[in-house]
Amino acid sequence: MEKTDLTLLIGGEAGQGLVTLGQLLAKSLVHAGYSILVTQSYQSRIRGGHNTFAIRVSTEAVVAPRESVDLLIAMNAETVTLHKAEVADGGLIVADEAHGTETDGCLLVPYQQLGETRFANVVALGVVSVLLGLDQPLVARSLDDFLGKKDHEMAEKNRQILTTAFDWCDQQTVAFEKLPPVAKPIQRLVMNGNEAIAMGALSAGVKFCSFYPMTPATSIALNLAAQASRMGLVVEQAEDEIAAINMAIGASFAGVPSIVPTSGGGFALMTEGVSLAGMSETPVLIVVAQRPGPATGLPTRTEQADLELVLYAGHGEFPRAIFSPGTVEECFWLARKSLEVAAKFQGPVFLLTDQFLADSSRAVTPFDIDNLEPIDPGVEIDASSLPYRRYAITPSGVSPRLLPGMTKHLVVAGGDEHPVDGHLTEDLNVRNLMVAKRLRKEQGIMAEVVPPEFQGDEGPDLLLVTWGSSKGSVLEAAAKLRNDSRRVGTLHFSQVWPLVPDQFLGYLESAGEVVCVEGNVYGQLARLIRRETGFGVHRRVLRYDGLPITPEYIIRELGD
């Protein structure tokens, strides 16, 4: 028997090697040609607690997580108790025979017989690979790649245990539907959202990253640090978030594209720096990886509750742009786009992601980085004209920008209001001119807004509107809700500010019912659309329990 779409859930304690097992399975599945989506749920502790690593795998493109489980790999007894109700009909539980699990549809594995406790994840890798019908040499190569240059004796021990697990499972009679083989596997990468943001920033020419560690944004900085020496990049862990944002502004003033990854609580400390970037007209990209608040909240869970925080952060009024990628691929491209907009319009730009997208991995086609040029840094090369006016009044609001120490001109920037030369002023007429100059940049930003993406039936009976990481779940829910008598469409915003009503209002007005799907309490995008257009959505599907929005959740909330 074969099944073309199934979900694996690995459960256990932190420290049991769940992530290693999950990553090895994910890479083996991708090398075999399958499409995957990996999601992780973990508690805020180093060891213990209950963590899960889920892989949805299919012969078709996977765009969303699924709630039901086909194969539950229980690394401890608690996992069976907590998740057996999620196992679908025809599903299977793989458990350690030493746990004394007594439940239907359970394959009891003699882990102690097949390998020592510390090799339990390798035993599970072998057993699960056989159950799925994966090519065993391919799985062995994935393990070899992971082990790399580790101790030869230890690597050989892992290989022996994997082979033993293969042989044991081959001898079992188990009623479980295997995956059909993929005829022509194509080359793809396993990459999560944060890795894609880091790669997109590198491709754009980012040269400075300052950060203070905060889940779920930290791995952006860690991925950049891993490439720092090769790419000529400085990554600085600051003493706090206030220092991090100001370091990035200083680096950008000196001429290098700069990025600051953080989360809601850390970003709250950065808001004065955001205002400084707005007044000094200094480019900076701030990545806000959302998690549930207020305060510490649920630091390892997901939410979409910081749109309004980012939209209004920083005292005073100044232009900004806010991007909200919905896929791993969009994380890459919008990281590039964000740095480009920041440089072109000289100010703060935000990339809003969340724990679900940050930590979720997908099989993606490799990005053609070799043919991508770094972004234009927006710095004037010809500095021969005199006098130099950093804040010259221009029709676009964008003024000439030179780097300090690179020409004979004095380069000045500061947080006080200023005339065209950048020095302090309290002339109120100048104040009016400068506010108008800065705000004129909004027109240029609006001219380059990424339009929301409409998919589905024109003039739909039901239109699902969303932003950010909920994109895949909304698309899959729409496909399930669509039938011969019901037209369904979706509208996804990958840029949530500024809004350009002409790009999307027609879709809203032509739909029978408009439902906004968001991971927050109030429906922040719905409120923003109402504020900017006067259009009120008819219903809202909202989730704020720390779990990602799923297609099943949307359908349940709609009552379908």
For the regions a protein language model found, what residue spans apply to each?
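Structural motif
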Residues: 71, 92, 208, 257, ...
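Active-site cofactor/cluster-binding pocket
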Residues: 1-204, 208-210
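Gly-rich Lys/Arg/Thr-decorated short loops/hinges at beta-loop-alpha junctions or inter-strand turns
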Residues: 147, 171-186, 201-206, 224-231, ...
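Short, conserved loop/helix-junction motifs that constitute active-site signature segments
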Residues: 82-90, 278, 505-510
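Thiamine diphosphate
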Residues: 2-67, 71-84, 208, 215-310, ...
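Flexible, low-complexity linker and terminal segments
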Residues: 190-198, 202, 334, 339-560
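Short beta-strand segments
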Residues: 74, 94-96, 262, 285-289, ...
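A short helix->loop->beta-strand "cap" motif at the edges of active sites that frequently abuts
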Residues: 87-93, 233, 282, 511-512, ...
